[in-house]
From Swiss-Prot:
GO cellular-component term (any): extracellular space
Compositional bias per record (Acidic residues), positions renumbered to this chain: 1794-1806
Ranges for region Disordered: 1514-1548, 1793-1852
Name listed for the protein in its UniProt record: C3 and PZP-like alpha-2-macroglobulin domain-containing protein 8
Signal peptide (from-to): 1-25
Species per Swiss-Prot/TrEMBL record: Homo sapiens
Protein encoded by which gene: CPAMD8
Tissue expression from the record: Highly expressed in the kidney, brain and testis and to a lower extent in heart, liver and small intestine. Expressed in the lens, cornea and retina. Strongly expressed in the distal tips of the retinal neuroepithelium that form the iris and ciliary body.
Length: 1885
């Protein structure tokens, strides 16, 4: 800091006259200045500079200037008298170091400036804050993430600057990017992001960058199922006594707030954390009932690990599972309860100063908290102050109140430089704690003044509020006869500046502590005033300062006060003060009603400052429990504002909080001579300015007087750098919020997400919204931004949507015709009185009530107590196909007796008709899809026809003609032209330039002349002046005629003499077979012509639609669709182009690439609407997300990502070209493209070819002996379409071109030829014409269509592709579609429309009804080709009439196609099959007609391509009724009614059922298949067990890469299925609802790329299965064998296993022989056998086809023998085993375990507590054990045959919980003890 005084210096007499003892400290009489400014300026912020002028008789003009890199960037000035401020607006984009310069002028103008000075400041580029808000914290796949961004300045005003935003997935891949975002209103920006159906699960991040700073917010993507209720665990906040029991509570409530009734299971233990994380406690299991809530005991002594150290820290882990009365389950987990012996933590409060001032009392405060962060009451602490370890100056013991202890050290010696504070817990609630607690320390440094004059501000006693007047007490050790100057800084800027004279309000004297002997060294003090001698009495005067609290001071302000003594010494102090949060923009959001019923309309009322932009959201109340911090709160806003605070980093301890000396005992610490002072410096008045965040420039005031100033110098403390957070702000709690520790599983949806402007003068706005049908509570919130009032956040408002009486039921999504379903209906009564309910269930004709034949509705009576829910069950049978609606209506009547008055319920219909007024009514409708039996099949008849066709030709700016063939007898045509100039038309005898061609030029010579010449570029034979005849802005129409040798050219659509422009007569008529179009060099053009059909310009065709003879009756469906655009079907089915799954990296591209082609087509033809653009870009964004999940670390892609051994060359090229094409429409990270391109080039061979690195899933692309040729062509196409920017990339494509040019003549198969021709054409290779000639020679042309067929492929009988031999079939090898599409791409690239049209017609015939083709690759390539053709031929208009009629005379339909509906897919159902159809069309343009036929067949494959074996294993019935004799079945239903239909308990018993499915398959041709998909449908009412599916992925030898669960189907993906061995999958299925008479289901396997290669096999339950006897239907009860025939050709599936085991017994299973080697430790298997290693266990599981899993060693120590009534089973079935007789009130000392009943419980209820202890002594056999070990484990040594023992299970196990299984062993071993043994962590799945 430098300065220059230009006025005369004051005489030294002024200093000499000042009193030595400091009694007079008046304002200095000499003129001078002091300028204070923020040490950190911020870009875009108006910074305030405070100016103080001493003793000036008049105003001084002060100018301030900010200089960066030597150039002034901003300046300002103002007139100052005594004190004032100047404001500087810092430009945006500025950052780094800058100079702040100031000048003062005005006293003596003739002498120049009065003063000037300068100092360095830091300019921080962050001058605004960004707040990111999402609608939810957790999303499911396919959800849309809704994002709002609020940008504000430090004063909370909107900032309208450009933003950049992007989203990262958990792997760091950039999923989407928004550039140059601009707030749409008041600093608010809205965005949204669609998630794909298979995103990377985990934590995602939204990043927003503004002014060079990045802000982020995270959200999670998880898969979850919406439960019906919410489960919460409320444990104690902490464990007070480790030897006593605490109480916890489990709460289960429906989302609408009502309690859940059901069964509760609790499992808990104590686990160590941090250093003690290796300590694992013992589990305790409890079961009981629950109604809304249930208390339970937490006894830590039973769970805590044995012999834990004194300072152990852990947490109680609690799992709770509730099963409601309707069978719904929910699991919750909590580990938020700390367990530790030291219950109190000590912290010095944030306002406890780190320095003391001699002569003034030191006031401090200690905060005491319990482990959960709550205030600790009644804690006795001892506070000591020491100068040295042996020099104690203060000791006090205080008891805490509300967690606080205040203390005051009356006086500290004036010569003391340091004080050491020690705080220690002495007693809790009066009980001494001894040496159990470690003390906490704080080091205090001295403040120094040479005159011993000190100021001390006293903070207010309470947080300040905006609008009030703040009172600050100021103490001074010198007389209060001075002018007090003050500065208030907040958010890094000066917000208040002023002065006031000091008035003494209190005067007192106090005795100072003795001075230290060490003399005090003075620095920076005038020699005229030596230090005063120590005095016994110190006078202290007290004055006050009153300030108005403004919103700019929220939430944290810094107050600086100072005065100047006559000798120029500045005396100062500063403090920080808190202001309660306050928004100037007061925002509120309220509903018009607090409670409403679902479906009603409510008003959402918003109030904010007028002109505000308000964003409103309404989400389910449970969202707030998902993850803390997801919504924008005032706390987040004001915490961000605190970050603008700039304070001295030397002002606080490096440790944020107390510390102790690690490794030293308390005794050693007390005697230690080492005193660790963290700072060896004192503070002075200059530090007060620095602590406030200010820099000072002055010529009059001396501020720096520190002692021992080695560290604290001008050089050491420049303008301080900004911090990420305020070091003296409220420190974050060391205990995170409890909600963060809780894992929630209920994720509701968003209702409202909307922004609006408040324009009404009243500041109110209203949204009328319809309440969703959900019964729940909705929380409304609002955030507003205003230019005048700034940001505001509303308090949340609650709307409860609730019906006190309602009914609910669920149906399976899909049922097969003939099946019976047991449907639970639940009635909920929350009306406060008992209700007599009449439930009426109505069904349509195709659904029957089992046991009530012929009825369309059934009424049942029930009584429901208040606050409860009651279920009933109804059995339905389904016979009609399609979507069926079921309606339930419930009427409730008040009944105080709850049906105990004897009213009859035998005929509920009669009581239902009584005259009473119902107190509750509800009705619900649900839909269920009923499908036919068998396997669905489909084919599509397609026709693309053009009665007359408009052709669109685009010509580049080069002189090359594009030729179109002339229809016969056509001697005139009209053409619409758009061009700048030089449009040329050629009349030629061939499709190329010929010697005798006629050339017509329009707008030549820069659009001034037109002419006719008799050769290309020939001399004009006729010409005319035609200025501006052409235009690029519009199409202009011309006609051309050559009849009889007279060539005429005219303007307009119709020829006339007046319209002739130029004419010429030839000697003889020209031979015109082709018409060419071009533009000259330097001009581009577009031409539109009509190609006329022959004869009457109409189209007609007749064809037959049929189904196979064996089709399932009633399953036939046919739909006709017409659209006037070749891309139309694709436009209408962009998200579902194939009837195939999309589970790998290549198939996923079907969701991506077609959208690019469609967008390009619509954009090029100017048809892209905002709606279509939004939809297609959403698909692209989702496809991009999905594809990145298949990326490998080296930048390549493979079918299953990192699960594959290497990347795939073919797939990486496919992804590269697709991503490159998408760049025009969505964000594609250039790094992803560069990585893929680099990987590809690295694989190139020396000859320029690309080898097939990785697996090629579609073997057609290998092309036999020329396999490298098509792959090289494919890769070079990808590189060219991506673009070659570098020399390396261009060199790579050149090498590939040379390879293809040399290889093209040798490639004779059409696939290689088509790909090579397209690649050479793209490369503009001279070899391209010859390649095209060869390709044309291989074409198959018939019936006006052109295509290419496979050669050198498998010798496959046509029957392989045809499902039946009755000509009802459709199958073309997908490679043929692909190669034909490449030929079309070549034609469109050359502009050969005439050759392209027959190819388009053939491709259109191969399309499926969804707009795709047969597989992924052919669909993507064909759609790209069709899109390019559509761009080339687009004419803009259509006018067609299409008639369709059936020969059955039951169908006739006329479709009109015109410009307004040409992209609308018009459909009509064809009523009956088989039938003949006749189609006719007339008009202009082309259209695509498709007939989609679907049907079901019993066995679709005559010659299967795979062997397929299916096996269904069911557990034996346990506790079920014995099978009925046939006589009973033939009797009346009353003999054995389904009494459990209305019995919830019975249904629960039936529902706990699981089966094991095993499917094996192998390829029946040589070698192996392409990538294959195995589809396994599940029995109705069952769902797949995900855990068993996940186990399949662990077997690397199986070849299974992925599985998907799609509804009732499980799909398994294999990269190939070999022929040498059986590929098998085995998994479990769990029953969800009871279904009887289950239908046989088809398991199918097929080659993904050639779906005609397939096999299908049916399976069903066995005749004797309990599943076959669940439900009855009259006389045919349980007789599944008598199921009626389902129509011609139908054969029911085999009962029992679908195949005999010996059918595949001779063929080995793939992957059973593992290369295990000799490594690995012994592993206990779930079958009780010890295996040499985990590898050997997997090998045994494969060979035995058994679900063996690793188990704890204790599982191999005992044979778990079930009760005699049960058969042996695997461990995973133990959940259903009834406990043995040894249950309660038994203590077995030898076992170290106890089971006891926790009475009292209601009769019939038992809550069991099981406690684990050390294992008993075992001393024989091969058991490794120790009597001194406390571990409950015991394991076998590695022996050939482990010894087995018998026992009985006495403890139940529930799947999915970490719960023990208990085995009672009466005679464990000879010499052993009787005992109850526990498998400690045996989680049997």
């Amino acid at each position: 800091m430098s300065g220059a005084l230009l006025w005369p210096l004051l005489p030294l007499l002024l200093l000499l006259l000042s009193a030595r003892d400091g009694v007079r400290a008046a304002q200095p009489q000499a003129p001078g200045y002091l300028i204070a400014a923020p040490s950190v300026f911020r870009a875009g912020v108006e910074e305030v500079i405070s100016v103080t002028i001493f003793n000036s008789p008049r105003e001084v003009t002060v100018q301030a200037q900010l200089v960066a890199q030597g150039e002034p960037v901003v300046q300002s000035q103002g007139a100052i008298l005594d004190k004032g401020t100047i404001k500087l607006k810092v430009p945006t984009g500025l950052r780094g170091q800058a100079l702040l310069k100031v000048w003062g002028r005005g006293w003596q103008a003739e002498e120049g400036p009065l003063f000037h000075n300068q100092t360095s400041v830091t300019v921080d580029g962050r001058g605004a804050s960004v707040f990111i808000q999402t609608d939810k914290p957790v999303y499911r796949p396919q959800h849309r993430v809704l994002i709002s961004i609020f940008t504000v300045s430090p004063n909370l005003r909107p900032v309208n600057e450009k933003l950049e935003a992007y989203i990262l997935d958990p792997r760091g891949s950039r999923m989407i990017e928004w550039r140059h975002l601009k707030p749409f209103c008041c600093g608010i920006t809205n965005m949204s992001f669609p998630l794909s159906d298979q995103p990377v699960l985990g934590e995602w991040f939204i990043f927003v960058e503004m002014q060079g700073h990045a802000y982020n917010k995270s959200f999670e993507v998880q898969k979850y199922v919406l439960p019906k209720f919410e489960l919460l665990i409320d444990p104690p906040r902490y464990i007070q006594d480790l030897d006593a029991c605490e109480t916890g509570t489990v709460r289960a409530r429906y989302t609408f707030g009502k309690p859940v009734a059901g069964a509760l299971m609790i499992n808990m233990t104590v686990n160590g954390v941090g250093y003690y994380s290796h300590e694992v406690g013992r589990p305790v299991l409890r079961t009981t009932k629950i109604l809304g809530s249930r208390d339970f005991d937490i006894c830590v002594r039973d769970m805590i690990p044995a012999d834990v150290p004194e300072h152990f820290r852990g947490r109680v882990s609690i799992w709770a599972m509730v099963t409601s009365v309707d069978g719904s389950q929910q699991v919750a987990f909590d580990d938020s309860t700390p367990v530790q012996r030291q219950l109190v933590d000590i912290r010095y409060s944030k306002d406890t100063r780190k320095q003391f001032k001699p002569g003034l009392a030191y006031v401090g405060k200690v905060e005491l908290s319990y482990p959960d962060g709550s205030p600790a009451e009644g804690v006795t602490v001892q506070i000591k102050a020491e100068l040295t370890p042996k020099d104690n100056i203060y000791t006090s013991e205080v008891v805490s109140q509300r967690g606080l202890v205040g203390f005051e050290i009356p006086s500290i010696p004036t010569s003391a430089q340091h004080v050491w504070l020690e705080t220690k817990v002495m007693a809790l609630n009066g009980k001494p704690v001894g040496a159990q607690y470690l003390p906490s320390y704080l080091s205090l440094g001295s403040w120094y003044s040479p005159s011993q004059c000190y100021l001390q501000l006293q903070p207010p006693s309470h947080p300040l509020q905006v609008g009030e007047e703040a009172y600050f007490s100021v103490k001074s050790t010198c007389p209060c006869n001075f002018t007090l100057y003050y500065e208030v800084a907040a958010r890094g800027n000066i917000v208040l500046s002023g002065q006031q004279p000091a008035h003494t309000t209190q005067q007192r004297s106090k005795r100072a502590a003795p001075a230290l002997e060490k003399p005090i060294r003075l620095t920076h003090l005038s020699e005229t005033e030596p230090p005063p001698a120590p005095e016994a009495e110190v006078d202290v005067c007290v004055t006050s300062l009153h300030l108005a609290v403004t919103p700019s001071m929220v939430p944290l302000g810094r107050l600086l006060v100072f005065y100047v003594r006559e000798n120029g010494e500045g005396v100062a102090d500063s403090l920080q003060f808190a202001v309660e949060t306050f928004f100037e923009n007061q925002v509120s959001v309220t509903y018009s009603a607090n409670e409403t019923q679902p479906g009603e309309v409510v008003d959402l009322r918003i109030r904010a400052a007028r002109g505000s932009c308000v964003c409103v959201a309404a989400v389910d109340k449970s969202v707030y429990l998902l993850r803390s911090g997801f919504r924008l709160t005032p706390a987040q806003v004001f915490q961000e504002l605190e970050d603008y605070d700039v304070s001295d980093s030397f002002g606080v301890s490096r440790e944020d909080g107390p510390f102790w000396w690690a490794g030293l005992t308390a005794q050693r610490r007390r005697r230690s001579s080492v005193f660790p002072w963290p700072w060896g410096i004192t503070k002075d008045s200059g530090f007060a300015f620095t602590e406030t965040g200010l820099v000072v420039m002055t010529d009059r005031v001396s501020l720096n007087h520190r002692q021992d100033g080695g560290l604290y110098t001008d050089e050491a403390v420049p303008a301080f750098q900004p911090h990420t957070g305020s070091l003296v702000a409220v420190a974050p709690s060391r205990h995170p919020p409890r909600t963060e520790k809780r894992k929630r599983t209920f994720f509701p949806e968003t209702w409202i997400w909307h922004c609006l402007n408040i324009s009404d003068p009243s500041g109110e706005g209203t949204l009328s919204v319809k309440v969703p049908d959900s019964i729940t509570s909705w929380v409304g919130e609002a955030v507003a931004l205003s230019t005048s009032q700034g940001l505001g956040i509303a308090e949340p408002s609650l709307l409860k949507t609730f019906k006190p009486f309602f009914v609910d039921f669920m149906l399976p999504a899909l049922i097969i015709r003939g099946e019976q379903v047991k449907i639970p209906l639940s009635v909920y009564n929350y009306m406060g009185t008992c209700a007599e309910v009449y439930m009426k269930l109505s069904v349509p004709k195709g659904i029957q009530f089992v046991g009530h034949p012929g009825k369309r509705h059934v009424t049942k009576k029930m009584c429901v107590a208040p606050g409860e829910a009651e279920p009933i069950w109804v059995v339905l049978s389904f016979s009609d196909l399609g979507l069926n609606n079921i309606t339930a209506k419930a009427l409730a009547y008040g009944d105080t007796n709850c049906c105990r008055d004897g009213r009859s319920s035998k005929h509920p219909e009669e009581n239902h008709a009584d005259r009473r007024v119902p107190i509750g009514v509800d009705h619900v409708r649900r839909s269920v899809m009923v499908e036919a039996e068998g396997v669905p099949r489909a084919y599509t008849y397609s026709a693309f026809f053009c009665p007359s066709e408009r052709v669109h030709i685009s010509t580049p700016n080069k002189y090359e003609f594009q030729y179109v063939q002339r229809p016969l007898r056509l001697t005139r045509f009209d053409v619409a032209v758009r061009a700048h100039n030089d449009a040329r038309v050629a009349l030629s005898s061939g499709p190329q330039d010929t010697a005798g061609m006629i050339e017509i030029v329009l707008g030549g010579h820069q659009n001034t002349r037109s002419w006719i010449s008799t050769s290309k570029m020939g001399e004009p034979v006729a010409s005319a002046h035609t200025a501006k005849i052409l235009s690029w802005d519009e199409f202009r129409t011309f006609w051309i005629s050559w009849r009889g040798g007279l060539i005429q050219v005219g303007h307009g659509p119709e020829p006339s003499n007046e319209s002739v422009i130029v004419a010429w007569t030839l000697p003889r008529p020209p031979e015109v077979q082709f018409i060419g179009f071009s533009t000259g060099w330097g001009s581009m053009g577009e031409f539109r012509i009509w190609r006329k059909m022959e004869v009457d310009e109409s189209y007609s065709e007749a064809f037959t639609l049929g189904v196979p003879h064996g089709a399932i009756p009633g399953s036939e469906r046919a739909t006709a669709s017409i659209i006037g655009d070749v891309m139309g079907p694709t436009l209408n089915h962009l998200n579902n182009l194939l009837r195939l799954p999309f589970g790998c990296g290549e198939q996923n591209m079907i969701h991506f690439a077609p959208n690019v082609f469609v967008l390009k087509y619509l954009q090029k033809t100017q048809q892209l609407s905002p709606e279509v653009e939004r939809e297609t870009t959403d698909y692209l964004v989702q496809g991009y997300q999905r594809q990145l999940t298949y990326k490998r670390q080296d930048g390549s892609y493979s079918a299953f990502g990192e699960r594959d051994a290497s990347g795939s060359m073919w797939l990486t090229a496919f992804v590269l070209k697709s991503f490159a094409q998408a760049r025009s429409f969505i964000f594609v990270d250039p790094r992803e493209l560069a990585a893929a391109k680099s990987w590809i080039i690295q694989q190139q061979q020396a000859d320029g070819s690309f080898l097939a690195v990785g697996r090629v899933l579609n073997k057609d692309i290998q092309g036999g002996i020329h396999g490298t040729v098509p792959l090289t062509a494919y890769v070079v196409v990808a590189l060219l379409e991506t673009g070659t920017a570098s020399e390396e990339e261009r060199g790579s494509t050149d090498k590939a071109r040379h390879f293809l040019e040399s290889a093209a003549p040798l490639a004779m198969d059409p696939y290689s030829c088509a790909l090579t021709t397209y690649a050479l054409t793209l490369l503009r290779s001279p070899a391209a014409p010859e390649a095209l000639r060869k390709l044309r020679s291989l074409a198959i042309m018939r019936d006006g269509v052109t295509h290419w067929s496979l050669s050198n492929s498998w010798d496959v009988d046509k029957g392989t592709f045809l499902s039946f031999s009755d000509r009802v079939s459709q199958s073309v090898v997908s490679a043929e579609v692909e190669m034909t599409a490449y030929a079309l791409l070549t034609y469109t690239l050359l502009g050969d429309v005439a050759a392209a049209l027959p190819v388009v017609k053939w491709l259109s015939q191969q399309r499926n009804a969804l707009g795709g083709f047969s597989s992924t690759q052919d669909t993507c390539v064909a759609l790209q080709a069709l899109a390019e053709y559509a761009i080339l031929s687009y004419a803009g208009g259509i006018n067609l009439t299409v008639s369709l009629a059936s020969t059955n005379l039951d169908y006739q339909e006329t479709f009109e196609l015109h410009r307004t509906n040409q992209k609308v897919l018009q459909t009509a159902a064809i009523p009956s099959l088989p039938t003949g159809l006749f189609v006719s069309a007339k008009g202009d343009g082309c259209c695509l007609m498709q007939i989609d036929v679907t049907y079901n067949v019993p066995d679709p494959v005559a010659k299967p391509a795979f062997q397929l074996l299916v096996s269904l294993q069911e557990p034996e019935a346990q506790g079920r009724p014995p099978p009925m004799p046939a006589s009973a079945a033939e009797g009346s239903r009353g003999d054995w009614p389904p009494a459990d239909d209305d019995d919830p308990a019975a249904d629960q018993h039936h529902q706990e059922y699981k089966v094991m499915l095993e499917v094996c398959t192998r390829w029946l041709h040589a070698g192996s298949s392409n990538m294959a998909v195995l589809e396994v449908p599940l029995l109705s009412g069952f769902r797949a067990d995900i855990e068993s599916l996940e186990q399949l992925l662990l077997d690397k030898h199986m070849g299974m890469k992925r599985y998907e669960v799609a509804g009732r189907r499980v799909l398994f993906y294999f990269d190939e299925i070999p022929s040498r061995c059986l590929t098998c999958v085995r998994f479990r299925a769990l029953r969800e609802c009871v279904v009887g008479r289950t239908s046989a289901l088809p398991v199918s396997v097929y080659d993904y790329y050639e779906p005609a290669f397939e096999a299908t096999r049916f399976y069903n339950v066995s005749t004797h299965s309990p599943l076959a006897r669940e439900l009855c239907a009259g006389p045919a009860c349980n007789e599944v064998e008598r199921a009626p025939a389902r129509g011609p050709g139908w054969f029911p599936g085999e009962s029992g296993p679908a195949v005999a085991p010996e059918e595949g017994a001779a063929i080995a299973r793939c992957g059973c022989d593992h290369d295990c080697g000799a490594q690995g430790n012994p592993v206990c298997g779930s079958d009780g056998v010890v295996y040499a290693s985990a590898c050997r266990l997997r090998e045994a599981a494969c060979r035995q086809a058994a679900p063996l899993e690793p188990a704890p060693p204790s599982c191999c120590a005992l044979e778990q023998r079930l009760p005699a009534s049960s058969s042996s089973t695997y461990g995973d079935d133990l959940a259903s085993v009834a406990p043995g007789p040894l249950q309660q009130d038994v203590k077995l000392n030898g076992a170290g375990l106890e089971v006891e009943d926790s009475d009292p419980e209601p009769e019939g209820e038992a809550e069991d507590r099981v406690t684990a202890g050390p294992r008993p002594p075992v001393s024989s056999g091969n058991l490794e054990s120790s009597t001194q070990s406390a571990s409950p484990f015991h394991r076998w040594g590695q022996t050939p045959a482990p010894q087995r023992h018998s026992g009985r299970v006495v403890g139940a196990h529930r799947p999915g919980l970490l719960s023990p299984v208990f085995v009672y062993s009466p005679a464990f071993q000879s010499g052993g003890e009787e005992g109850l043994w526990m498998s400690n962590t045996c989680t049997l799945r």
